[in-house]
Amino acid sequence: MHEGVQVSSKLEQLQALLAPVVVALGYECWGIEFSAQGRHSLLRVYIDKEGGVLVDDCAIVSRQISGVLDVEDPISVEYTLEVSSPGMERPLFTLEQFAKYVGEQVKIKLRSPFEGRRNFQGLLRGVEEQDVVVQVDDHEFLLPIDMIDKANIIPSFD
């Protein structure tokens, strides 16, 4: 089985397991990243709430998630758990999140090349069905959401 497929299904399993825990604590589960790197992996859970996230919020969620992970044991390798806010360079995971940030500058990395490239940096123009519309210079790209490996807002300090 392809490693990307394993990570993707693992990510879906973790999302189904952990998102309800985060929501039950009164936070939004902004997104989950799981990267298997050799013998050590990283599980990063992004939380958000109205008014922002404090360090104490991350600690509360981390304790609860750790308990669930200890009982359910969905990760068979050694890993580090990080709970954090999305921050200024907010990662984008869903079409709804992309739609919320139309008009912002974004950086997008694809899982595999699309129209000869994997990296796109430009203006987020919108969402059309299952595609994210990004304008790079004078060209618009319709990037399928399922091809996006990583996407982040580029903060502007105007």
Swiss-Prot record:
The keyword Cytoplasm applies. One of its GO terms (cellular component) is cytosol. Keywords: Cytoplasm, Ribosome biogenesis. Pfam families: DUF150_C (PF17384), RimP_N (PF02576). It comes from the Bacteria. It is found in: Cytoplasm. One of its GO terms (biological process) is ribosomal small subunit assembly. Belongs to the RimP family. Required for maturation of 30S ribosomal subunits. PANTHER family: RIBOSOME MATURATION FACTOR RIMP. This is Ribosome maturation factor RimP. It comes from Pseudomonas fluorescens (strain ATCC BAA-477 / NRRL B-23932 / Pf-5). The gene is rimP.
